[in-house]
Amino acid sequence: SVDAGVTPLAATSSDVAVAVPEPMPGGDEQVEYTSVQKYNLRVFDAAGNEKLCIDLSSLTEDSDYFYVSAFAVDGQGNTVLMTGGNALTILDAQGNVTGSIDLSTEQTGVGNIIALADGSVAALVYSEDYSSFDLCPVDMTGMKLGESIASLPTDAYSAAPSGGGYDLCYNKGESFYGYTMATDTEEKLVTWINCDVNSSNVSSASITESGDIVCLSSEYSNTGEGATTYLITLKKTPYDQVPQKTTLTLACVYLNYDVKNMVLDFNRKSSDYRIEVRDYSEFNTDDDYTAGLTKLITEIGSGAVPDLLITDNLPMDTFGAKGLFEDLWPYIEADEEIGGRAGVVEPFFNAISQDGKLYEVTSGFAVRTIAGPASIIGTEPGWTYDDMFAALDQMPEGCELFGLGTTRNDVFTSICTMNLSKFVDWNTGECSFDSEEFISLMEFANRFPETFDWENHEWTPEDNDSTRIKEGRQLLVMLSLSDPYSYTYYSEMFNGEMALKGYPGVPGSGAVFYSNGTGLAISSTCANKDAAWSFVRTLLTRDYQENYGYGFVTNRELFDENIKNMVGQSYYTYDESTGEEKEIKFTQENADTIMELIENTTMVADYNSSQINDIINEEVAYYFSGEKSAQDVAATIQNRVSIYVNEQR
């Protein structure tokens, strides 16, 4: 047990070595202390007995900040230390320094050093385009890096020497791989979470000669009580010797920490069901970081739908129109613990529903809107693009509508995203891009500059939104509200006289929702829907949202409680132009404004219709360049998007 903390760890067939920063004693408050850092290299045998303790202080004498970023031990007991990321230091088996290698000549940089199965040590040197690693042996005689002997994927950054017939092993996404240099092939051995292991907690994973997988797992407590570290051994076991459970598949593109813990908890507690994760991020390549997402969307579109789905970045409007996923409203209504519709923030879930059907749930949300000074724009939500410029006419000469550097593409993209669900009805396949409203949006955006010369602009604190608004140089701000603090932050910009006016053409409050947490959905073809719901409902529980909720939570009881508890609380902010601290209190009036905003918001922003956005941006460029009229561009967009939408339904 080492309280000071262990940095890198390396091993030979008989010994284990660790680099440990040595803690300095505390003491009397009357005494002035100077910070001192000291590293020891400690070598232990298989029984845990210390064989060697080497003081590395001599290596720190010429460095203001010394640290060991990686090290490896070769078959003869020589240790290679990577210090500060720019040098390798070689020590013999007795701990004597025998030489060093300057890494600053490696222009692309060295990512790591690793011991190989043949007992040698090699450096992982980034390739010229950073798409792979060149595996370069460490020449301990010539004190240099040798020529590359293999090209490894960037996932091999944390590679370790391997037994079981593999040269190296490493993590890749949620899975663990063995790599064979002779054939330049990798083999997926396990998906950690499907073995009830949290990959986020795994370190020092390796493969034994018998093929077992051994790793350390540090599990952290939410109560701040520190971590407990376990030594885990995974053994190949015949399928018929494993307790049998019904499997539910969960597909995702990256598995975040919160849902990972949900899956582990579900699998440990359920005696009848087990969730198996398929993380499509493993199909991403260095050339295409969206390959996994594309593959998942294609498979779902062709009918290969998983039982459960993490909906982040996926076109749920398209999937919903095809009836691929279960309506979750009946499950919420029948769930007595959640409390039915009254137990969730219903306006948000109504907004993300399609034709009254709720295809996904999430733990948090936020609201986007446009705000300005109440004395100029009025307090009632709703206005037109012409109203915006009419309000601007009341401001001093030189005042701008939005923040410094706002271009027409900024304005068009932002407002179009907020309004996209108005122009596309996935349930009927009807589109309305040839409407006066969409044409007005293009014409409004075209009144802004094409570009802003940031390269030649020297930014100062006076350029921030807060200072510009207070000095009458900026009228409005597009903002996101995700908690009471964000409201008071923006309200202070307008000296407490902020009006939430909303986006032109957006009904109700003029604001739009967007999801601020992971979404989950259940396939309409899932054979065990009740079991799937017992997992999905976790997102909506008070316990989950107290621990993992972010922004405005969707559990109604907790949401109301959070708002109520913030009334009277003080926030402190700094005036960026003066540096003065200012206290701001969250009032009951502020709370009422937030509640009214949420209760009257009916639309949701669409960030996931990338194909539609590509069509729109391609065509609107012809209008912005003056090549086509707004009407002609709108007609083309209407035609192209209508065809696309109906092909996808």
Predicted regions and their residues:
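Hinge/lid segment of periplasmic solute-binding proteins
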Residues: L314-T369, D386-D387, E497-P504
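Extracytoplasmic/periplasmic solute-binding protein
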Residues: K357-R368, D387-N446, G472-L476
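Conserved N-terminal structural module of periplasmic/extracytoplasmic solute-binding proteins
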Residues: E29, A93, E106-D118, A123-E128, ...
